[in-house]
């Protein structure tokens, strides 16, 4: 029996009122569609989107303007960009998991939904967030 594909908008759980979702983000078009789908499903909820540029294709800047257009969505987006290809002045780009987590922890309570999108293992983002949210 085939049980389906994991990490396609997988609900990891709700912790102290904040639902964490995990999605395997593999292409800018899919990321944009996922953000829009979550906005529709959780209409009226405050959503934090965390996007990690995980693959060489994503982190190498090969998607150009298509990747950067995601930032124009009416949404709160934090980028995890290990190779520093993204450039903006919004202060929402981080180069390490630790820096990203520290930023989220400063104001996570303002959000109802945290959507993690990466084509890498999301455990480095999900587990610290879950643990701290559960503890508070």
Predicted regions and their residues:
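ATP-dependent carboxylate-amine ligase
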Residues: 1-136
């Amino acid at each position: 029996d085939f049980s389906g594909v994991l990490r396609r908008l997988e609900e990891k759980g709700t912790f102290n009122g904040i639902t964490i979702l995990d999605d395997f983000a593999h292409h800018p078009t899919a990321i944009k569609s996922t953000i829009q789908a979550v906005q529709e499903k959780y209409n009226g909820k405050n959503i934090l989107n965390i996007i990690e540029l995980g693959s060489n294709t994503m982190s190498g800047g090969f998607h150009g303007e298509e990747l950067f257009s995601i930032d124009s969505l009416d949404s709160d987006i934090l980028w995890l960009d290990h190779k520093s290809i993204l450039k903006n002045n919004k202060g929402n780009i981080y180069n390490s998991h630790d820096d990203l987590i520290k930023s989220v922890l400063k104001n996570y309570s303002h959000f109802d939904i945290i959507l993690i999108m990466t084509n890498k293992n999301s455990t480095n983002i999900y587990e610290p967030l879950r643990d701290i949210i559960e503890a508070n």
